C-alpha cells in the first residue's frame, strides 16, 4: 500500500485544503453559548486553562508549554466575545486533547489549513475564526474522561458498570452552529436536476449545512482493539504507518485520537483532564465533505455522489441559527436554512431518505438509494446498539474510493467500463475519448442513477471494525460473495486511508466492479424496456438481486421485454394471469381469460398494473389498456415473484447432451417448474432458438403463442454468471392440472384406465386422491391432487393394457366392480333388516358373495373388511405412482453425488404411498434413472420405462407439464371473483409420463 509521509497524513488528510471546510462558501462563525458554574474548589488544583498557561512536566522530565493553544483560545474570545477562557478556568466537566508548542511548530510548517489567498496558514493569526474553532472544539469533549475510560460505553441496562472496549468515537465539543456555511450557485453540483433548480432560486447563495448533525472524535485504545480483534497491523493500515511507510507502527499500550498518539495522559485538573497529543488534532470532515474537497484524487467519485444529494429545508436548524445570529447578508434574503442530505437507505436519525423534498413524496429516481448517507456525521452501523448514541460510539462506515486515475482507466479500458461508456457515454466523446478527469466525469453523467448506484454501493461497507485487513476475507460484495476472492494480497488494492468523522475513505487503485454489471440481470438494469423486470429484481422483499448477482452459480435468464410495435402496448408487459383460470372455472359461461398488464411508472418509480380480458385463441388482449391502476402493490409483488421464478434457470441451456431428436431439451426453473429450449445452429442464430413454457406447449396450435428470442447477452465474457435472453413475451406455466390431463379421455384415451383407478381411489378413510379445494383455497381447475404440497412431482401412468391385465389377475380391484359388489351388499343388508328368516338368507348371500370375490364359499365372510382392504390397496397402488421430484425426459438428471464425489446416475425418490414399519410410518421409494430416457425400478425389482410416444390424438404421452394452484382472495380463503385481488398462495408442479407397466409397492405382489 502506498503511504504519504506528510504530518497531516496522520489523519489521512494529506495536506488537503481544509480551508474549504472553514472558509469556503462564505462560512461565518457563531457566538458561543455556555452555562458556567462559577464555583472553584481550590483543593482540586488548577483549572484546565491555568494548567495550559503554566505548562507542566512530562513523565520523562520534558516541560510542556501550551502558549500557542492559549493564544488560540484568547484569539477566539477576542474575535467573537466568546468565553472559552472563562469556561476552561471554572468548575465544569471538560477533557482536552491538546498539542504543545513544539507540535504547533510542526503543524504550521506543513499546515493543512489554507488562508483566503490559498496559502498555508503559518500562525494562529492567519487562521480564520472557523479554523480556530475546528482545532479547539475538535480536540475537546464535554465530559471528563481518563484514557482508560475512553473505550467505555454506558451499560445497556441503564445501570451497572460501563461496558469497556466498546467505544471508538465520541461526539466532540464542536457545535453544528460553530459556523454558517453559504453555498453560492457556482459551487452547487452541476449534474443534478434538483440542485439546478436551487441555482436559479438562490442566485445570491443559500445557507446549507453539510449535514446538520454533530461530528465525532475517533479513539483507538488497547481495550477497544483487543475486544474487536483489530491487530496492530490493522491499525497501522488505517493510519498509513508501519512497515514501508517511514513512520513507526503502533506499539502495545498506545492510545490515539484521530490517529495521533497520546503522548502524556491523564493530567488532572479541577475541571477535567488534559491529554497531551504528539501532534495537533482538529475537527474531521465527513466522508462526503472530504471527497468533495479532494479534487486531486476524488473529483470523479465526488461528482458522482453529488447526483445523490440535495438540500433539505430544516425549520429546526433555521430557528437555531436565527437564535444565535443573523444570516449573513450575502445569502439569500429569504433566510431559509437547508441541510444537505444524500438519498440513501440510512440517513439522519437512521431513517431512509428516499423522497425528493417538495415533490408530493415523489421517490428519488428509480429508488436508486445509497447504502448510507456519506455526509451523515452521526452515522452508526446497523449492527450496533439499539441506542443511537451508543451505536455511534461503537463503529463507523467505510467507502472504497477508486482514485481519479483508476476510474479513468476503468472507464476507458475495462470490459464493464467500456460497456457502460458505449451505452451511456455522451456524443462529444464518442470519437475522441475524454482526457481530463473533469471530462471523464462529464462522460459518465448520463449513466442513470439506478445503474451507477450499484458501483457506489458495492464500494460502501457498513462497518469499519469489520473492514480491516485481518478481516478482509469476510468482506462481502453486493452479491454477498467475498469481495477479495482471487486477490492474494488485498492490501495492495489500496493506496492510502483517510480517517473522517463518520468513517474511513480507502483510496483504491482498482475498481471493485459490482457483480450487477457482470450478472445475467445486467441487461434488465440498463434497458428501459426491461424496467418492469428490473424493478422486481430490485425489490428488497423479493430478494432476487443478491440471488442473480451470485457469481458462484451459472444462470440462463429469460427476460420478457415491454417493447411492442403496438403503440397501445409499447412499454407494457402482458402476462396471462393464472388466477384467471380459476375465475373462468367459477363462471362457466365465460369464454375469455384475463391478463395482468404491467407498466413502469417513472414518476413514482414503481410497477403498476391493470387487468384486461385476454383471448386464449388469439393470445391477444380483447381490450385496450387504460393505464388505470387497479392492482395493489401486494398483488403485483406476488405476480412478479411468480414471473421471475419461472424465467430463471440454473445452468446453461445451450448445448444440452440430452436433447431429443428434434433438438428440444427440458430445464427446471428456479421455482421448480419446467421450460423447453431448442438451440439454434449457433449462439448467433436467434431466429432458430425456441423456448416454451408449459402453457406455450399445451397451446402450440393457437395463434401468436410462439416466443421469439430477440437478443442474447453472454455475461460470461466478463467473468459473469451466465447468459441472458431477451424474449418478446413472457414464458407461461401450464394451465392444466393432473386431473385436467388424465380425465380428458377424448384427447388422452391412453390414460383412461389409470384415471379411472385414480378418480375412484378413496380408500377406507374415504379421502379421495382429487380434491376441489386446497386448504380451503380456490384452485385453477376442477380438481387438484390432494397430496401435492408446494413441491414438484412426477405421475407415472401405466398403459391401459397393463392396468386391465392387473385387474384381470385380481391383483388390484376393479373400482367399478367394487362399487357394484358394495351396492349388492348394502342392498342385502337393507332387504333383510326386518325379515324373520333373514339370518338364513344372509348366510346364503355371504356364501355367494365370498365365492364370487375370493373363489371360496365362506359363511363367515367379513365383506366390509374385504371391501376396505381392497379400497386401501387400490389407493396405495395409485399413490405409489405419484413421486416426489419432477423427473423429465431429455433433461439433465440431477441425482446428487456418490460417496466418491462423482455424479450419481440413480436416485431414490419418495412416493405418496406410506407404509407402517413397526411403530413408524415411512414413505416407500422408487429407484429412478433419468436423462435422455427414464427408467423406474419399484420395490419388487420390476423395471419400467417411460414410453416416449405420441398418442392417437397427436399429443405427447410423456413430459406433459402441469401446474396446480392455490389462490386466496386477498388474505382470505374463498372463490376467485376478481383477478385483481387474487393472490397466488402456493402451487405445485407435476409432469406426467406414460410407462410400460404398473409399479409394485410391495403391498400386493406382482
Named regions from a protein language model:
Residues 15-16, 30-1006:
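Mature, structured domains of secreted/extracytosolic soluble proteins
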Amino acid at each position: 500500500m502506498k503511504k504519504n509521509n506528510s504530518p497531516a497524513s496522520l489523519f489521512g488528510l494529506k495536506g488537503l485544503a481544509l480551508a474549504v471546510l472553514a472558509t469556503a462558501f462564505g462560512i461565518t462563525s457563531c457566538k458561543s453559548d455556555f452555562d458556567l458554574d462559577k464555583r472553584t474548589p481550590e483543593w482540586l488544583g488548577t483549572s484546565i486553562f491555568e494548567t495550559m498557561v503554566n505548562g507542566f512536566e512530562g513523565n520523562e522530565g520534558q516541560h510542556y508549554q501550551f502558549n500557542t493553544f492559549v493564544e488560540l483560545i484568547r484569539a477566539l474570545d477576542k474575535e467573537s466575545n466568546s468565553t472559552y477562557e472563562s469556561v476552561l478556568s471554572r468548575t465544569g466537566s471538560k477533557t482536552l486533547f491538546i498539542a504543545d508548542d513544539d507540535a504547533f511548530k510542526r503543524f504550521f510548517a506543513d499546515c493543512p489549513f489554507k488562508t483566503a489567498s490559498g496559502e498555508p496558514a503559518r500562525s494562529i493569526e492567519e487562521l480564520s475564526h472557523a479554523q480556530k474553532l475546528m482545532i479547539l472544539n475538535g480536540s475537546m469533549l464535554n465530559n471528563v474522561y481518563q484514557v482508560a475510560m475512553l473505550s467505555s460505553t454506558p451499560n445497556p441496562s441503564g445501570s451497572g458498570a460501563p461496558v469497556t472496549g466498546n467505544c471508538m468515537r465520541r461526539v466532540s465539543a464542536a457545535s453544528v452552529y460553530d459556523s454558517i456555511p453559504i453555498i453560492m450557485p457556482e459551487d452547487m453540483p452541476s449534474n443534478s436536476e434538483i440542485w439546478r433548480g436551487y441555482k436559479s432560486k438562490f442566485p445570491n447563495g443559500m445557507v446549507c449545512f453539510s449535514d446538520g448533525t454533530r461530528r465525532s472524535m475517533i479513539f483507538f485504545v488497547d481495550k477497544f482493539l483487543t475486544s474487536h480483534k483489530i491487530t496492530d497491523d490493522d491499525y497501522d493500515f488505517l493510519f498509513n504507518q508501519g512497515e514501508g511507510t517511514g513512520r513507526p507502527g503502533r506499539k502495545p499500550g498506545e492510545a490515539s485520537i484521530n490517529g495521533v498518539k497520546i503522548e502524556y495522559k491523564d493530567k488532572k485538573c479541577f475541571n477535567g483532564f488534559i491529554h497531551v497529543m504528539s501532534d495537533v488534532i482538529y475537527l474531521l470532515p465527513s466522508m462526503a465533505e472530504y471527497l468533495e474537497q479532494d479534487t486531486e484524487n476524488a473529483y470523479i467519485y465526488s461528482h458522482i455522489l453529488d447526483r445523490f444529494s440535495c438540500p433539505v429545508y430544516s425549520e429546526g436548524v433555521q430557528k437555531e441559527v436565527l437564535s444565535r445570529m443573523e444570516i449573513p447578508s450575502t445569502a439569500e434574503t429569504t433566510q431559509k436554512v437547508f441541510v444537505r442530505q444524500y438519498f440513501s437507505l440510512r440517513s439522519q436519525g437512521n431513517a431512509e431518505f428516499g423522497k425528493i423534498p417538495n415533490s408530493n413524496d415523489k421517490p428519488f429516481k428509480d429508488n436508486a438509494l445509497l447504502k448510507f448517507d456519506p455526509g451523515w456525521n452521526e452515522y452508526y452501523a446497523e449492527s450496533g446498539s439499539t441506542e443511537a448514541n451508543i451505536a455511534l460510539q461503537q463503529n463507523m462506515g467505510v467507502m472504497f474510493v477508486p482514485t481519479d486515475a483508476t476510474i479513468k482507466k476503468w472507464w476507458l479500458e475495462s470490459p464493464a467500463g467500456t460497456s457502460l461508456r458505449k451505452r451511456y457515454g455522451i456524443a462529444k466523446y464518442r470519437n475522441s475519448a475524454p482526457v481530463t478527469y473533469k471530462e471523464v466525469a462529464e462522460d459518465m453523467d448520463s449513466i442513470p442513477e439506478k445503474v451507477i448506484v450499484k458501483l457506489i454501493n458495492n464500494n460502501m461497507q457498513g462497518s469499519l471494525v469489520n473492514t480491516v485487513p485481518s478481516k478482509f476475507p469476510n468482506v462481502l460484495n453486493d452479491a454477498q460473495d467475498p469481495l477479495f476472492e482471487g486477490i492474494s494480497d488485498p492490501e495492495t488494492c489500496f493506496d492510502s486511508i483517510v480517517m473522517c468523522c463518520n468513517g474511513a475513505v480507502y483510496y483504491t487503485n482498482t475498481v471493485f466492479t459490482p457483480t450487477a454489471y457482470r450478472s445475467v440481470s445486467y441487461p434488465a438494469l440498463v434497458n428501459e424496456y426491461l424496467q418492469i423486470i428490473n424493478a422486481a429484481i430490485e425489490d428488497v422483499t423479493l430478494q432476487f438481486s443478491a440471488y442473480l448477482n451470485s457469481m458462484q452459480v451459472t444462470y440462463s435468464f429469460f427476460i420478457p421485454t415491454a417493447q411492442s410495435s403496438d403503440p397501445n402496448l409499447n412499454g407494457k408487459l402482458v402476462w396471462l394471469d393464472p388466477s384467471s383460470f380459476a375465475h373462468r372455472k367459477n363462471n362457466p359461461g365465460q369464454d375469455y381469460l384475463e391478463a395482468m398488464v404491467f407498466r413502469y411508472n417513472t414518476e413514482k418509480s414503481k410497477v403498476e398494473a391493470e387487468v384486461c380480458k385476454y383471448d386464449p385463441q388469439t393470445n391477444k388482449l380483447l381490450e385496450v389498456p387504460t393505464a388505470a391502476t387497479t392492482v395493489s402493490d401486494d398483488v403485483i409483488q406476488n405476480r412478479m415473484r411468480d414471473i421471475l421464478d419461472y424465467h430463471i434457470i440454473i445452468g446453461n441451456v445451450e448445448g444440452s447432451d440430452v436433447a431429443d431428436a428434434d433438438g428440444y431439451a427440458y430445464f427446471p426453473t428456479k421455482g421448480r417448474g419446467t421450460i423447453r429450449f431448442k438451440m439454434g445452429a449457433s449462439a448467433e442464430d436467434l431466429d432458430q432458438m425456441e423456448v416454451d413454457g408449459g402453457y406455450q406447449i399445451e397451446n402450440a396450435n393457437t395463434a401468436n403463442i410462439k416466443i421469439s428470442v430477440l437478443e442474447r447477452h453472454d455475461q460470461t465474457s466478463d467473468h459473469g454468471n451466465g447468459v441472458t435472453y431477451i424474449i418478446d413475451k413472457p414464458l407461461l406455466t401450464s394451465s392444466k392440472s393432473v386431473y385436467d390431463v388424465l380425465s380428458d379421455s377424448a384427447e388422452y384415451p391412453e390414460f383412461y384406465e389409470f384415471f379411472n383407478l385414480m378418480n375412484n381411489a378413496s380408500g377406507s378413510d374415504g379421502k379421495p386422491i382429487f380434491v376441489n379445494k386446497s386448504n380451503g383455497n380456490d384452485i385453477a381447475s376442477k380438481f387438484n391432487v390432494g397430496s401435492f404440497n408446494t413441491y414438484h412431482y412426477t405421475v407415472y401412468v401405466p398403459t391401459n393394457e397393463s392396468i386391465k391385465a392387473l385387474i384381470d389377475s385380481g391383483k388390484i380391484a376393479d373400482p367399478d366392480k367394487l362399487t357394484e359388489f358394495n351396492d349388492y351388499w348394502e342392498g342385502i343388508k337393507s332387504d333383510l333388516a326386518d325379515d324373520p328368516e333373514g339370518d338364513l338368507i344372509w348366510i346364503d348371500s355371504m356364501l355367494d358373495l365370498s365365492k364370487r370375490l375370493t373363489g371360496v364359499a365362506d359363511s363367515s365372510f367379513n365383506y366390509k373388511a374385504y371391501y376396505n382392504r381392497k379400497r386401501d390397496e387400490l389407493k396405495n397402488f395409485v399413490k405409489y405412482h405419484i413421486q416426489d421430484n419432477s423427473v423429465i425426459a431429455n433433461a439433465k438428471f440431477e441425482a446428487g453425488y456418490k460417496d466418491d464425489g462423482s455424479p450419481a446416475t440413480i436416485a431414490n425418490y419418495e412416493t405418496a404411498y406410506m407404509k407402517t414399519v413397526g411403530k413408524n410410518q415411512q414413505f416407500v421409494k422408487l429407484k429412478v434413472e433419468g436423462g435422455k430416457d427414464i427408467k423406474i425400478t419399484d420395490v419388487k425389482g420390476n423395471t419400467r420405462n417411460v414410453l416416449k410416444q405420441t398418442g392417437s390424438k397427436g399429443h405427447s404421452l410423456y413430459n406433459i407439464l402441469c401446474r396446480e394452484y392455490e389462490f386466496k382472495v386477498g388474505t382470505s380463503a374463498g372463490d376467485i371473483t376478481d383477478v385483481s385481488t387474487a393472490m397466488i398462495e402456493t402451487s405445485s408442479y407435476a409432469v406426467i409420463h406414460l410407462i410400460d407397466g404398473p409399479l409394485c409397492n410391495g403391498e400386493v405382489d406382482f
